[in-house]
Regions:
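NAD(P)H-binding glycine-rich loop region in Rossmannoid oxidoreductase-like domains
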Residues: 43-86, 90-94, 107-114
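Substrate-positioning beta->alpha
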Residues: 156-164, 181-202, 206-207, 234-235
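Conserved beta-loop-beta element that borders a ligand/cofactor-binding pocket
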Residues: 128-153, 173-182, 217
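A conserved pocket-lining segment of Rossmann-fold NAD(P)-dependent short-chain dehydrogenase/reductase
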Residues: 147, 164-187, 207, 215-225
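Conserved Rossmann-fold NAD(P)-dependent oxidoreductase catalytic core, especially the SDR/UDP-sugar
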Residues: 85-127, 134-137, 142-144
Length: 409
Protein backbone atom coordinates (compact mmCIF):
# COMPACT_ATOMS: atom_id res chain seq x y z
CA UNK A 1 0.00 0.00 0.00
CA UNK A 2 1.25 3.47 -0.95
CA UNK A 3 0.15 6.25 1.38
CA UNK A 4 0.09 10.00 0.81
CA UNK A 5 0.30 12.19 3.91
CA UNK A 6 -0.19 15.93 3.44
CA UNK A 7 1.02 18.22 6.20
CA UNK A 8 3.67 15.58 6.87
CA UNK A 9 5.96 17.88 8.84
CA UNK A 10 3.27 19.12 11.20
CA UNK A 11 2.60 17.75 14.66
CA UNK A 12 0.14 15.05 13.59
CA UNK A 13 1.89 14.40 10.29
CA UNK A 14 5.28 13.80 11.86
CA UNK A 15 3.90 11.33 14.39
CA UNK A 16 1.79 9.52 11.81
CA UNK A 17 4.59 9.30 9.24
CA UNK A 18 6.98 7.93 11.85
CA UNK A 19 4.60 5.09 12.69
CA UNK A 20 3.78 4.39 9.04
CA UNK A 21 7.50 4.17 8.32
CA UNK A 22 7.91 1.88 11.33
CA UNK A 23 5.33 -0.42 9.74
CA UNK A 24 6.99 -0.12 6.33
CA UNK A 25 10.40 -1.03 7.75
CA UNK A 26 9.10 -3.95 9.82
CA UNK A 27 9.74 -2.23 13.16
CA UNK A 28 6.07 -2.11 14.22
CA UNK A 29 4.70 -5.63 14.08
CA UNK A 30 1.48 -5.24 16.03
CA UNK A 31 -0.78 -4.46 13.07
CA UNK A 32 -1.31 -7.93 11.63
CA UNK A 33 -0.86 -8.24 7.90
CA UNK A 34 -0.99 -4.49 7.19
CA UNK A 35 1.68 -3.69 4.61
CA UNK A 36 3.02 -0.22 3.85
CA UNK A 37 5.16 0.00 0.71
CA UNK A 38 5.66 3.77 0.41
CA UNK A 39 4.92 6.86 2.49
CA UNK A 40 4.70 10.00 0.34
CA UNK A 41 5.35 12.94 2.69
CA UNK A 42 3.89 16.15 1.27
CA UNK A 43 4.42 19.48 2.99
CA UNK A 44 4.82 23.17 2.23
CA UNK A 45 8.24 22.64 0.67
CA UNK A 46 7.00 19.91 -1.70
CA UNK A 47 6.41 20.69 -5.37
CA UNK A 48 3.18 20.59 -7.41
CA UNK A 49 4.87 17.95 -9.55
CA UNK A 50 5.35 15.72 -6.52
CA UNK A 51 1.72 16.13 -5.50
CA UNK A 52 0.62 15.27 -9.01
CA UNK A 53 2.80 12.17 -9.14
CA UNK A 54 1.83 10.93 -5.71
CA UNK A 55 -1.89 11.45 -6.33
CA UNK A 56 -1.51 9.15 -9.30
CA UNK A 57 0.14 6.39 -7.27
CA UNK A 58 -1.35 6.47 -3.77
CA UNK A 59 -3.76 3.93 -2.30
CA UNK A 60 -4.80 6.06 0.68
CA UNK A 61 -4.64 9.77 1.53
CA UNK A 62 -4.31 11.36 4.96
CA UNK A 63 -5.00 15.06 4.44
CA UNK A 64 -3.53 16.75 7.49
CA UNK A 65 -2.44 19.95 5.76
CA UNK A 66 -3.99 23.15 7.03
CA UNK A 67 -3.55 26.58 8.55
CA UNK A 68 -3.93 27.09 12.30
CA UNK A 69 -2.46 30.51 13.10
CA UNK A 70 -2.49 32.77 10.01
CA UNK A 71 -1.64 36.45 9.94
CA UNK A 72 -5.16 37.26 8.74
CA UNK A 73 -8.42 35.32 8.64
CA UNK A 74 -8.50 35.08 4.83
CA UNK A 75 -5.63 32.60 5.05
CA UNK A 76 -7.88 30.16 6.89
CA UNK A 77 -10.05 29.60 3.83
CA UNK A 78 -7.12 29.61 1.44
CA UNK A 79 -5.06 27.17 3.51
CA UNK A 80 -7.79 24.83 4.70
CA UNK A 81 -10.33 24.89 1.86
CA UNK A 82 -8.08 25.91 -1.02
CA UNK A 83 -5.53 23.12 -0.67
CA UNK A 84 -8.28 20.56 -0.11
CA UNK A 85 -9.74 21.58 -3.49
CA UNK A 86 -6.35 21.22 -5.18
CA UNK A 87 -5.81 17.79 -3.64
CA UNK A 88 -9.20 16.43 -4.67
CA UNK A 89 -8.94 17.90 -8.18
CA UNK A 90 -5.58 16.18 -8.61
CA UNK A 91 -7.00 12.85 -7.50
CA UNK A 92 -9.86 13.32 -9.98
CA UNK A 93 -7.36 14.06 -12.74
CA UNK A 94 -5.84 10.62 -12.21
CA UNK A 95 -9.22 8.91 -11.70
CA UNK A 96 -7.89 7.82 -8.32
CA UNK A 97 -10.81 7.01 -6.02
CA UNK A 98 -8.73 5.69 -3.14
CA UNK A 99 -9.95 6.39 0.43
CA UNK A 100 -9.26 9.93 1.66
CA UNK A 101 -9.13 11.11 5.26
CA UNK A 102 -9.66 14.74 6.28
CA UNK A 103 -8.34 16.22 9.50
CA UNK A 104 -11.02 18.63 10.70
CA UNK A 105 -11.76 20.19 14.06
CA UNK A 106 -14.47 20.44 16.67
CA UNK A 107 -14.63 24.10 15.69
CA UNK A 108 -16.30 23.03 12.43
CA UNK A 109 -19.44 22.44 14.51
CA UNK A 110 -19.84 26.25 14.60
CA UNK A 111 -21.69 25.89 17.89
CA UNK A 112 -21.19 27.43 21.32
CA UNK A 113 -17.92 29.28 21.67
CA UNK A 114 -17.03 28.28 18.10
CA UNK A 115 -20.08 29.99 16.57
CA UNK A 116 -18.04 32.82 15.01
CA UNK A 117 -14.82 30.92 14.35
CA UNK A 118 -13.27 31.73 10.97
CA UNK A 119 -11.07 28.69 11.43
CA UNK A 120 -14.19 26.62 12.07
CA UNK A 121 -15.87 27.98 8.92
CA UNK A 122 -12.86 27.05 6.79
CA UNK A 123 -12.81 23.56 8.29
CA UNK A 124 -16.56 23.14 7.72
CA UNK A 125 -16.11 24.19 4.09
CA UNK A 126 -13.40 21.56 3.76
CA UNK A 127 -15.68 18.92 5.28
CA UNK A 128 -18.49 19.74 2.86
CA UNK A 129 -16.07 19.62 -0.05
CA UNK A 130 -14.79 16.17 0.93
CA UNK A 131 -18.25 14.75 1.59
CA UNK A 132 -19.46 16.02 -1.79
CA UNK A 133 -16.35 14.54 -3.42
CA UNK A 134 -17.27 11.17 -1.92
CA UNK A 135 -20.79 11.36 -3.36
CA UNK A 136 -19.48 12.43 -6.76
CA UNK A 137 -16.70 9.86 -7.17
CA UNK A 138 -17.74 7.01 -4.91
CA UNK A 139 -14.48 7.34 -3.00
CA UNK A 140 -14.50 6.46 0.68
CA UNK A 141 -14.26 9.71 2.66
CA UNK A 142 -13.32 9.79 6.35
CA UNK A 143 -13.88 13.15 8.05
CA UNK A 144 -12.49 13.41 11.58
CA UNK A 145 -13.34 16.32 13.89
CA UNK A 146 -10.48 16.33 16.36
CA UNK A 147 -10.66 17.96 19.80
CA UNK A 148 -7.59 19.56 21.42
CA UNK A 149 -4.47 17.55 20.55
CA UNK A 150 -1.32 17.01 22.59
CA UNK A 151 1.72 14.75 22.80
CA UNK A 152 5.40 14.61 21.90
CA UNK A 153 6.70 17.03 19.25
CA UNK A 154 3.75 19.41 19.62
CA UNK A 155 4.93 22.99 19.17
CA UNK A 156 4.65 25.14 22.32
CA UNK A 157 3.36 28.72 22.25
CA UNK A 158 1.39 27.94 19.10
CA UNK A 159 -2.02 26.31 19.32
CA UNK A 160 -1.74 23.77 22.14
CA UNK A 161 -2.06 24.87 25.76
CA UNK A 162 -0.73 21.52 26.98
CA UNK A 163 2.40 21.83 24.84
CA UNK A 164 3.00 25.32 26.23
CA UNK A 165 2.42 24.22 29.83
CA UNK A 166 4.72 21.20 29.49
CA UNK A 167 7.45 23.22 27.81
CA UNK A 168 7.33 26.06 30.34
CA UNK A 169 7.13 23.89 33.43
CA UNK A 170 9.94 21.64 32.16
CA UNK A 171 12.10 24.72 31.61
CA UNK A 172 11.14 26.51 34.85
CA UNK A 173 9.21 29.20 33.00
CA UNK A 174 5.97 30.78 34.27
CA UNK A 175 2.60 29.74 32.88
CA UNK A 176 -0.65 31.67 32.65
CA UNK A 177 -4.00 30.06 33.48
CA UNK A 178 -6.92 32.45 33.14
CA UNK A 179 -9.71 30.07 34.15
CA UNK A 180 -8.96 26.73 35.83
CA UNK A 181 -12.58 25.60 35.47
CA UNK A 182 -12.58 25.57 31.65
CA UNK A 183 -13.75 22.16 30.43
CA UNK A 184 -11.60 20.51 27.77
CA UNK A 185 -11.78 17.37 25.68
CA UNK A 186 -8.26 16.32 24.74
CA UNK A 187 -6.86 13.70 22.39
CA UNK A 188 -3.41 12.16 22.83
CA UNK A 189 -1.33 11.85 19.68
CA UNK A 190 -0.68 8.11 20.01
CA UNK A 191 -4.42 7.46 20.34
CA UNK A 192 -4.99 9.53 17.21
CA UNK A 193 -2.31 7.62 15.29
CA UNK A 194 -3.81 4.29 16.38
CA UNK A 195 -7.17 5.40 14.97
CA UNK A 196 -5.47 6.41 11.72
CA UNK A 197 -4.02 2.91 11.44
CA UNK A 198 -7.51 1.53 12.08
CA UNK A 199 -8.78 3.71 9.24
CA UNK A 200 -6.03 2.40 6.99
CA UNK A 201 -7.23 -1.13 7.74
CA UNK A 202 -10.87 -0.22 7.11
CA UNK A 203 -11.71 -0.34 10.83
CA UNK A 204 -12.43 3.35 11.45
CA UNK A 205 -15.04 4.45 13.99
CA UNK A 206 -18.06 6.27 12.49
CA UNK A 207 -20.36 8.77 14.16
CA UNK A 208 -22.64 11.75 13.82
CA UNK A 209 -22.25 14.97 15.78
CA UNK A 210 -24.81 16.80 17.88
CA UNK A 211 -22.99 20.04 18.49
CA UNK A 212 -19.72 18.90 20.06
CA UNK A 213 -21.13 15.59 21.25
CA UNK A 214 -20.11 12.41 19.46
CA UNK A 215 -22.96 10.03 18.63
CA UNK A 216 -21.36 6.70 17.60
CA UNK A 217 -23.10 5.25 14.56
CA UNK A 218 -21.91 2.64 12.10
CA UNK A 219 -23.68 4.61 9.34
CA UNK A 220 -22.41 8.01 10.47
CA UNK A 221 -20.99 10.48 7.95
CA UNK A 222 -18.15 11.44 10.26
CA UNK A 223 -15.41 9.57 12.12
CA UNK A 224 -13.98 9.94 15.61
CA UNK A 225 -11.22 8.67 17.88
CA UNK A 226 -12.82 6.54 20.61
CA UNK A 227 -10.17 7.36 23.24
CA UNK A 228 -10.27 10.95 24.50
CA UNK A 229 -10.27 12.47 27.98
CA UNK A 230 -12.56 15.18 29.36
CA UNK A 231 -11.10 17.26 32.15
CA UNK A 232 -10.53 20.84 33.27
CA UNK A 233 -7.66 23.16 32.53
CA UNK A 234 -6.82 23.28 36.22
CA UNK A 235 -6.64 19.49 36.53
CA UNK A 236 -4.30 19.35 33.53
CA UNK A 237 -1.96 21.94 35.03
CA UNK A 238 -1.96 20.23 38.44
CA UNK A 239 -1.10 16.88 36.86
CA UNK A 240 1.77 18.35 34.84
CA UNK A 241 3.21 19.91 38.00
CA UNK A 242 2.91 16.52 39.73
CA UNK A 243 4.80 14.96 36.83
CA UNK A 244 7.51 17.59 37.15
CA UNK A 245 7.95 16.85 40.85
CA UNK A 246 8.12 13.09 40.27
CA UNK A 247 10.59 13.08 37.40
CA UNK A 248 13.89 13.82 39.11
CA UNK A 249 13.59 11.33 41.97
CA UNK A 250 13.55 7.61 42.63
CA UNK A 251 10.15 6.35 41.44
CA UNK A 252 8.18 6.10 44.67
CA UNK A 253 4.49 5.25 44.86
CA UNK A 254 4.38 4.79 48.63
CA UNK A 255 2.98 8.29 49.15
CA UNK A 256 0.44 8.31 46.32
CA UNK A 257 -0.05 7.73 42.59
CA UNK A 258 2.23 10.54 41.44
CA UNK A 259 4.85 8.46 39.67
CA UNK A 260 4.93 6.36 36.54
CA UNK A 261 4.67 3.27 38.76
CA UNK A 262 1.04 4.08 39.50
CA UNK A 263 -0.03 5.33 36.08
CA UNK A 264 -2.20 2.82 34.20
CA UNK A 265 -1.48 2.94 30.48
CA UNK A 266 -5.07 3.92 29.72
CA UNK A 267 -4.97 6.92 32.07
CA UNK A 268 -4.68 10.63 31.33
CA UNK A 269 -1.88 10.89 33.89
CA UNK A 270 0.21 8.39 31.89
CA UNK A 271 -0.27 10.39 28.70
CA UNK A 272 0.57 13.71 30.35
CA UNK A 273 3.71 12.26 31.94
CA UNK A 274 4.93 10.97 28.58
CA UNK A 275 4.16 14.33 26.99
CA UNK A 276 5.89 16.27 29.77
CA UNK A 277 9.03 14.14 29.54
CA UNK A 278 9.36 14.95 25.83
CA UNK A 279 9.94 18.62 26.75
CA UNK A 280 12.65 18.06 29.36
CA UNK A 281 15.85 19.97 28.56
CA UNK A 282 19.09 18.03 28.24
CA UNK A 283 20.40 18.93 31.69
CA UNK A 284 17.24 17.62 33.41
CA UNK A 285 17.35 14.21 31.75
CA UNK A 286 20.07 13.15 34.20
CA UNK A 287 20.07 13.40 37.99
CA UNK A 288 21.93 11.97 40.97
CA UNK A 289 20.63 9.17 43.15
CA UNK A 290 21.36 8.90 46.86
CA UNK A 291 24.30 6.50 47.18
CA UNK A 292 24.98 5.06 50.62
CA UNK A 293 28.75 4.70 50.38
CA UNK A 294 31.26 3.15 52.78
CA UNK A 295 34.65 1.41 52.38
CA UNK A 296 32.87 -1.84 51.46
CA UNK A 297 31.14 -0.33 48.42
CA UNK A 298 27.73 1.27 47.98
CA UNK A 299 23.98 0.65 48.21
CA UNK A 300 21.51 2.71 46.16
CA UNK A 301 17.73 2.47 46.14
CA UNK A 302 16.23 2.60 42.63
CA UNK A 303 12.47 2.08 42.97
CA UNK A 304 9.93 2.19 45.82
CA UNK A 305 6.42 0.80 45.32
CA UNK A 306 3.32 0.97 47.47
CA UNK A 307 2.61 -2.77 47.66
CA UNK A 308 5.43 -4.50 45.79
CA UNK A 309 8.54 -3.54 47.72
CA UNK A 310 11.70 -1.91 46.43
CA UNK A 311 14.58 -2.48 44.02
CA UNK A 312 18.15 -1.46 44.79
CA UNK A 313 21.64 -1.81 43.36
CA UNK A 314 24.46 -3.06 45.59
CA UNK A 315 28.16 -2.75 44.78
CA UNK A 316 30.70 -4.72 46.82
CA UNK A 317 34.42 -4.07 46.64
CA UNK A 318 36.82 -7.01 45.99
CA UNK A 319 36.91 -9.51 48.86
CA UNK A 320 34.09 -7.81 50.78
CA UNK A 321 31.29 -9.68 52.58
CA UNK A 322 27.94 -7.96 53.08
CA UNK A 323 24.77 -9.02 54.85
CA UNK A 324 25.16 -11.42 57.77
CA UNK A 325 21.57 -10.90 58.90
CA UNK A 326 18.14 -12.52 58.69
CA UNK A 327 14.45 -11.49 58.55
CA UNK A 328 11.30 -12.87 60.15
CA UNK A 329 8.89 -12.14 57.33
CA UNK A 330 10.40 -10.15 54.51
CA UNK A 331 12.25 -11.80 51.68
CA UNK A 332 14.73 -10.65 49.06
CA UNK A 333 16.08 -11.73 45.71
CA UNK A 334 19.74 -11.17 44.81
CA UNK A 335 20.65 -10.99 41.12
CA UNK A 336 24.35 -10.62 40.35
CA UNK A 337 24.77 -8.77 37.05
CA UNK A 338 28.53 -8.21 37.08
CA UNK A 339 31.41 -9.89 38.84
CA UNK A 340 31.85 -13.23 40.65
CA UNK A 341 30.32 -13.87 44.04
CA UNK A 342 29.12 -16.36 46.63
CA UNK A 343 25.74 -16.14 48.36
CA UNK A 344 25.41 -18.09 51.58
CA UNK A 345 22.36 -18.92 53.72
CA UNK A 346 21.84 -20.77 56.98
CA UNK A 347 18.54 -21.53 58.69
CA UNK A 348 18.48 -20.05 62.16
CA UNK A 349 19.09 -22.70 64.82
CA UNK A 350 20.92 -25.03 62.41
CA UNK A 351 24.49 -25.48 61.21
CA UNK A 352 24.05 -26.37 57.53
CA UNK A 353 25.24 -23.61 55.18
CA UNK A 354 23.74 -23.32 51.69
CA UNK A 355 26.21 -22.01 49.08
CA UNK A 356 25.29 -20.43 45.73
CA UNK A 357 28.14 -19.36 43.46
CA UNK A 358 26.94 -16.68 41.06
CA UNK A 359 28.35 -14.40 38.37
CA UNK A 360 27.38 -11.87 35.75
CA UNK A 361 28.16 -14.46 33.08
CA UNK A 362 24.96 -16.33 33.96
CA UNK A 363 22.17 -14.19 35.37
CA UNK A 364 20.37 -16.04 38.17
CA UNK A 365 18.10 -14.99 41.02
CA UNK A 366 18.73 -16.32 44.53
CA UNK A 367 15.90 -15.98 47.07
CA UNK A 368 16.83 -14.93 50.61
CA UNK A 369 14.47 -17.13 52.62
CA UNK A 370 12.71 -15.79 55.74
CA UNK A 371 14.33 -17.19 58.86
CA UNK A 372 17.66 -17.77 57.08
CA UNK A 373 20.65 -15.58 57.85
CA UNK A 374 22.44 -14.70 54.63
CA UNK A 375 25.39 -12.90 53.12
CA UNK A 376 26.97 -12.10 49.77
CA UNK A 377 30.73 -12.33 49.23
CA UNK A 378 32.73 -10.81 46.39
CA UNK A 379 35.11 -13.61 45.35
CA UNK A 380 37.13 -11.39 43.01
CA UNK A 381 40.39 -9.78 44.07
CA UNK A 382 40.17 -7.06 41.42
CA UNK A 383 36.57 -6.46 40.29
CA UNK A 384 33.49 -5.03 41.95
CA UNK A 385 30.49 -7.29 42.47
CA UNK A 386 27.29 -5.63 41.20
CA UNK A 387 24.00 -7.03 42.46
CA UNK A 388 20.40 -6.01 41.79
CA UNK A 389 18.47 -6.56 45.01
CA UNK A 390 14.70 -6.88 45.25
CA UNK A 391 12.94 -6.76 48.62
CA UNK A 392 9.21 -7.41 48.98
CA UNK A 393 8.77 -4.36 51.23
CA UNK A 394 10.19 -0.86 51.38
CA UNK A 395 12.72 -0.53 54.19
CA UNK A 396 11.20 0.96 57.33
CA UNK A 397 13.88 2.10 59.82
CA UNK A 398 11.33 1.92 62.66
CA UNK A 399 10.51 -1.73 61.88
CA UNK A 400 13.51 -3.04 59.96
CA UNK A 401 12.86 -6.77 60.59
CA UNK A 402 16.62 -7.28 60.30
CA UNK A 403 18.74 -9.20 62.85
CA UNK A 404 22.52 -9.61 62.78
CA UNK A 405 23.89 -13.17 62.81
CA UNK A 406 26.88 -14.47 60.89
CA UNK A 407 26.22 -17.29 58.46
CA UNK A 408 29.43 -19.10 59.33
CA UNK A 409 30.07 -19.25 63.07
Amino acid sequence: MKILVTGAKGFVGKNLCCQLNNIKEGKARCYGDLQVDEVFEYDIDSTPEQLDSWCGECDFVFNLAGVNRPKDNDEFMKGNFGFASTLLDTLKKHNNTCPVMLSSSQQASLTGRFGNSEYGRSKKAGEDLFLEYGKETGAKVLVYRFPNLYGKWCRPNYNSAIATFCNNIANDLPIQVNDRSVQMEILYIDDLVEEMICALKGQEHHCEFEGLDVLPSAEGRYCYCPVTHKTTLGEIVDTIYECARAVRAVPDSTEGPSTALEMPQDSLRYRLMSTFLSYLPKEKAIFDLKMNVDPRGSFTELVHTLNCGQVSINISKPGITKGEHWHNSKWEQFIVVSGHGLIQMRKEGTDEVLNYEVSGDKIQSVIMLPGYTHNIINLSETEDLVTVMYCNEVFNPERPDTYFDKVEK
